[in-house]
């Protein structure tokens, strides 16, 4: 089982990177023990909530194996996990932004997938012999990406920055889902459909990165980390069709542990 040993070794290294910078990592004296734990607020959608990685704890699909929970645990941070499945940028504005307090030390934001309609597009494209309809659905999402998306994302990230001016703000992107293969009898994604969806994810990440730069935030891009671990790969970090259906095509436990945690966690270095 060498591949699993390598995975475990990678996980240990990733968590060591995060844990090495924990505010209390050197706590050996009463003075250190009395220090206030640093705070971390995680905003966003189902990817940030951890849906698809282990059993969800609530209706928002929050999981103890999502990268916010893992980073907070290893880094000994006080976590406010406000992320919720189905959230759009408007939802983060209206329902999650208040979770960010002025004294927050770290804030991550992962949102945008629902704004471009990834869930309905995936359901549409999963139907057999449906390339034209799939392409139309993807085109609709890309039209928004090329239209109001940049302004809306910049406004949201700017609002988060205004809530906690001293916090380290990290915008988080999305992984490549497909590798050109279709390995399930339950769905049928053609090579053309997979290419369209992957291309839209790449464009989404570009837009998120640009919006992050505009407000002085960091951008954590998981694309390279997930390379070789798309659905239907030898060791996938992304679910295929699963129950509940809403957890399909989300990072699994390995994706959160070995993909997202080191990619996002490195920005917690002081």
Regions found by a protein language model. Name each.
Residues 1-29:
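Secretory targeting and sorting signals
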Residues 24-39, 92-109, 153-168, 264-268:
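Short amphipathic alpha-helices and their capping/turn segments at secondary-structure boundaries
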Residues 30-83, 97-98:
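Serine-esterase "nucleophile elbow" of acetyl-processing enzymes
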Residues 39-44, 48-50, 78-83, 105-110, ...:
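Structural recognition of the beta-strand scaffold that forms the well-ordered cores
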Residues 51-63, 122-130, 248:
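Acidic/histidine-rich helix-loop elements
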Residues 73-77, 152-168, 203-220:
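A structural motif corresponding to the C-terminal end of an alpha-helix
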Residues 91-145:
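Oxyanion-hole/transition-state-stabilizing segment in secreted/luminal serine hydrolases
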């Amino acid at each position: 089982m060498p591949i699993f040993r390598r995975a475990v070794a990678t996980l240990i290294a990733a968590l060591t990177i995060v844990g090495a910078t924990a505010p209390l990592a050197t706590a050996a004296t009463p003075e250190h023990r009395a220090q206030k734990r640093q705070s971390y607020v995680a905003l966003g959608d189902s990817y940030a909530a951890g849906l698809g990685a282990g059993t969800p704890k609530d209706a928002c699909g929050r999981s103890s194996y999502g990268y916010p929970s893992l980073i907070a645990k290893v880094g000994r941070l006080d976590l406010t996990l406000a992320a919720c499945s189905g959230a759009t940028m408007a939802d983060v504005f209206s329902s999650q932004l208040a979770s960010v307090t002025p004294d927050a030390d770290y804030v991550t934001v992962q949102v945008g997938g629902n704004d471009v309609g990834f869930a309905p597009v995936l359901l549409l494209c999963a139907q057999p012999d449906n390339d034209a309809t799939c392409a139309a659905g993807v085109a609709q999402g890309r039209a928004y990406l090329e239209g109001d998306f940049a302004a809306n994302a910049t406004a949201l990230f700017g609002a988060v920055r205004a809530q906690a001016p001293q916090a380290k703000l990290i915008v988080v992107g999305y992984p490549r889902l497909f590798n050109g293969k279709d390995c399930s009898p339950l769905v049928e994604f053609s090579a053309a459909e997979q290419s369209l969806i992957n291309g839209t994810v790449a464009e989404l990440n570009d837009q998120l990165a640009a919006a992050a730069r505009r407000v002085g935030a960091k951008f954590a891009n998981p694309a390279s980390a997930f390379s070789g671990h798309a659905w239907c790969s030898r060791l996938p970090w992304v679910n295929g069709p699963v129950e509940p259906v809403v957890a399909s095509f989300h990072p699994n436990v390995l994706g959160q542990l070995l993909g997202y945690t080191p990619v996002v966690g490195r920005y917690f270095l002081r």
